[in-house]
Amino acid sequence: MKRTALIGQLSTTHLDQAVTLQGWVNRRRDLGGLIFLELRDRSGLVQVQVEPDSPAFAQADQLRAEYVAEVEGIYRARPENQRKGGAADYEVIASRVKVLNTAKTPPFELDKGESVAEDIRLKYRYLDLRRPEMQRHLLLRSRAMAAVTAFLDSSGFVQVETPMLTKSTPEGARDFLVPSRLNPGEFYALPQSPQLFKQLLMIAGYDRYYQFARCFRDEDLRADRQPDFTQLDMEMSFVEQDDVLELQEGLMAHVFKATLDVDLPRPFPRLSYFDAMDRYGSDKPDLRFESALVDVTDLFQGGEFKAFAAAQSVKVLAAAELTRKQIDELERVAKQNGAGGLAWLKRDGDSFTGGISKFVGSVAPQLIKRSGVQDGGTLLFAAGDWKKAVTALGAVRLAVRDLFDLTSSGPRFHVSWVTDFPQLEFDEDSGTWTYMHHPFTAPHPDDAELFGTLRQGEIRAQAYDLVLNGFEVGGGSVRIHDPAVQTKMFEAIGFTEAQAREKFGFFMDALEYGTPPHGGIAWGFDRLVMVMSGASSIREVIAFPKNNRGADLMAEAPSLVDDAQLAELGVGVLSPS
């Protein structure tokens, strides 16, 4: 039962030779006494022709869709008048067909998988994964992993696995908890990231580390989130921020070239967090298209339009001509993202009509010049608190992108860095400061003295995000290696010494034993492959994902467990109220 090759490996070297192929029956047709089969494996499709007088005919007549079959025959070029170019110009004339296994009728047609409800696809994931599109996604993922491994191995990195059962520590999301049978009433947590362990490896002297780490976060799900996911996790000793960014650019460029034959221009552009928010309304801006937010606060200060005159910030976005229905839809987007509304104007020569046009007569020339709006185009405004205004108009910017397909004429991929994030952010609900990334991020050396002062909100973090086509695909930082600075960071976020030691005592002890300067990054590997493949969701690039309710419909998880198992763990279950 030895096959000659995978179907996709057949080439002109096999022409007019006997080949043995194995795979699934993609389609079967009877035509004028002939049987035509499409045989499929992970690498491609080939047409098989079975003639009425062939000894293979009786077996071929039994085949149905998704049967597993072995075909032996002559690989030949199809007649010239049937050729269309590519692999379809060749076929196999069968001399022997063997049914290796039968199959039930699938619950959906595999070649129409995109139109099938996602829950059906996930319930029968083993069938969904037979579809060529899904196989392309997972093969791309495999090639990307291989490219990463080759690059990092050649760059002196050591691959180390870190624990899957660890201590529950505050990292932003809820932990998945695992009860300990041997220690009743105590729990492990599944890791949200290997953050502390990779820093401990730097303290241990391993210099450069990486792993494809499985991570777990019990949070609300959306199109690009899963409760269990894969990070490409990396850490380097004796580095500054530029060293990490330079190596990451080389790695990203290598992965794209090795998997997609795409050359990424380097160096990647860098934006500060403030500039990204101020110009694009996002800390992960999609830079494949030019459109940017423009500040026009000064043009309306003291003016008669009260909503703008008193606003901390007035931002404008220029767009092409929009219908009233489209403007209403964009206003809905703005309101969903915190704006009170969306003011607008239409340019008509040297003036404006519609919307708030009666309030802008005297500043029309300056608005036209500053915004760059074309004649007939539309201006969209958001006003109020700076962050709310830019965030709302940033969401509108992306909606306009989708409305006019603004990325179609730009580069297929655009990679950039966002740097200089705030170290801390103030939580209005609790009235306390919290970390923006995690509590081990090093402050900018010029700002560290601001800890504990009224200006600690101005501290810049040595943190950086890697952004691809408007998706954050990586995030990292230079880490705190000085125990005194780490203590100040814990104090800034309201941890008492006892609280800090309860959560991170083992790590605080380790910092006292000669910690080198170090920094690192983690890529959201599922999200990266999603963008590279053009998939609409990370569920399309994970073999066995959960749905958007966190359920595995195929394995029927999560599920109830019996009382005996719970008793053995010392765990009781409260009925939901």
Swiss-Prot record:
It holds the Pfam family tRNA-synt_2. It catalyses: tRNA(Asp) + L-aspartate + ATP = L-aspartyl-tRNA(Asp) + AMP + diphosphate. InterPro entries: Aa-tRNA-synt_II, aa-tRNA-synth_II, aa-tRNA-synth_II/BPL/LPL, Asp-tRNA-ligase_1, Asp-tRNA-ligase_1_N, Asp/Asn-tRNA-synth_IIb, AspRS_core, GAD-like_sf. Its EC number is 6.1.1.12. It is found in: Cytoplasm. ATP binds at residues 217-219, 226, 472, 524-527. L-aspartate binds at residues 171, 217, 437, 479. GO terms for molecular function: aspartate-tRNA ligase activity; ATP binding; nucleic acid binding. GO terms for cellular component: cytoplasm. The keyword ATP-binding applies. It is an enzyme of class 6 (ligase). The keyword Signal does not apply. Belongs to the class-II aminoacyl-tRNA synthetase family. Type 1 subfamily. Homodimer. Catalyzes the attachment of L-aspartate to tRNA(Asp) in a two-step reaction: L-aspartate is first activated by ATP to form Asp-AMP and then transferred to the acceptor end of tRNA(Asp). This is Aspartate--tRNA ligase. It comes from Deinococcus deserti (strain DSM 17065 / CIP 109153 / LMG 22923 / VCD115). The gene is aspS.
